[in-house]
Amino acid sequence: MQANINWLDNPEVFRVNQLPAHSDHPFFRDYREWQKQHSSYQQSLNGKWKFHFSANPMDRPQDFYQRDFDSSNFDSIPVPSEIELSNYTQNQYINVLFPWEGKIFRRPAYALDPNDHEEGSFSKGADNTVGSYLKRFDLSSALIGKDVHIKFEGVEQAMYVWLNGHFVGYAEDSFTPSEFDLTPYIQDKDNLLAVEVFKHSTASWLEDQDMFRFSGIFRSVELLGIPATHLMDMDLKPRVADNYQDGIFNLKLHFIGKKAGSFHLLVKDIKGHTLLEKNEDIKENVQINNEKFENVHLWNNHDPYLYQLLIEVYDEQQNLLELIPFQFGFRRIEISPEKVVLLNGKRLIINGVNRHEWDAKRGRSITMSDMTTDINTFKENNINAVRTCHYPNQIPWYYLCDQNGIYVMAENNLESHGTWQKMGEIEPSDNVPGSIPQWKEAVIDRARINYETFKNHTSILFWSLGNESYAGDNIIAMNEFYKSHDDTRLVHYEGVVHRPELKDKISDVESCMYLPPKKVEEYLQNDPPKPFMECEYMHDMGNSDGGMGSYIKLLDKYPQYFGGFIWDFIDQALLVHDEISGHDVLRYGGDFDDRHSDYEFSGDGLMFADRTPKPAMQEVRYYYGLHK
């Protein structure tokens, strides 16, 4: 198979040769590696890569992936990073509009005409910048002789991959992992990996989030050595019985490779006591159903108690091939007949924030230090929940939320705001995904990868279909996907407020943005058909949060109201050196000669971009502390 640049224009092509999405569990060679938190089955490709920037697809070096290509004039760039922050092209912040509006006329393929697939819209787009990446590497000794996969944890926005001159695959969706099999083309020494990253594709219509518009390989890249028999996926569904005391353990395992030998499974409590032990022969698919644990310790924000699952995989000679450790909790979220959201049988109150991934120097290429700082800030200020606005976050974030009792609304990478709202008016004539058949599989795929990757994380209480994408048959299909795959969580989507006739088919909860307290109360006083929340409220721009108490009072009056997520947690601003003053300063939208611009609308956080809390954080700490 050869790469085809026209895939950029086709909403029905979004992944080529990509391995099926699977759970994000780690795997180690043995217990010693687990203790050191270093797996010899993983080889990082982070660091300096050779790089060439092109202003558009026509100017890109088309054969750069060939082994005999002369790349001596290429620059170098760190991976992970944003291309724009290496000064190759302009930084641009924008809220609703698409970056090309006012310069290039585009409409989503098939949106206005079922026969118009907008050929050349992006593949020949004069504004579609291209990053050509090259990386030479030798396999680590632990990977030699094994099947080898490569995992890109995040690439904005569309990428083609080659190894040693051979086309490997294509992927869109900037914020979920993309994994490919390199085995047919891998060498022990002197491998040449080539990645071509386009800033725009049909995925751009689905990734119109309120943020700086970056591109590049902005999350980690690693090689994975696959043992002869390997646990590729596990689906863990611990349930809480109706007495809210006992736990029911359910697990599905999917093995690949030789699928021979046996596995040893253990479940232990925090004191090391074994609650379950099994030894079974390996088959492609194994199920463990309805194992009852009496008087389990329930997981919640105040007491994030996690049990330890250990799976040891052995070959036919009883040699240990891999160890899979995973922590999980028992918790139960549901809606009562009175339309009250309950966690473990008790009323749930969300003291939440929306959180973009952000670092003032690195953009969305954040670090583990950023994440742990944010978790600590949550706990210091009585924030118990986070909405991953408006895309899946880095994998370690979900583990931190499990461990620290942070309730997660896990949102898909979907926002098509500019396709249905123009100049402040609702005008959905070219809305995607809408009900357009050619866009259906692309958005279901985004739901699938979000689910499959993060399905085992106890902290996730809600799946969110996306943000500000209007509503139609394709949003309904996403809702149905989650309901058919997961009955242990609730589904959320706010955008259906614009299509109230679809509310019975989309979202388990009534969700609004910035609805004034009086309007919230009107809903709650009129026999609400669903529990109510504000997925965005208390817009924290400038001197704000002064009216927060009016919302918090409603929590005491109406149990059907279960709180909301403040917009938002951290400013999106970049720390740059000012040549005139000689100081490092934070710059916002519009400060980079970027037009159009929503200017300081990028600064809506409870914290400045350098993670200094704003005065409004005091209000949050006080009011969220009233309902811990």
UniProtKB/Swiss-Prot annotation:
It comes from Lactobacillus helveticus (Lactobacillus suntoryeus). It catalyses: Hydrolysis of terminal non-reducing beta-D-galactose residues in beta-D-galactosides. The keyword Chloroplast does not apply. Induction: By lactose. Part of an operon consisting of lacL, lacM, and galE. Component of a beta-galactosidase. Keywords: Glycosidase, Hydrolase. Pfam families: Glyco_hydro_2, Glyco_hydro_2_C, Glyco_hydro_2_N. This is Beta-galactosidase large subunit. Its EC number is 3.2.1.23. The lineage of its organism: Bacteria, Bacillati, Bacillota, Bacilli, Lactobacillales. GO terms for cellular component: beta-galactosidase complex. The active site is at 468 (proton donor), 536 (nucleophile). The keyword Hydrolase applies.
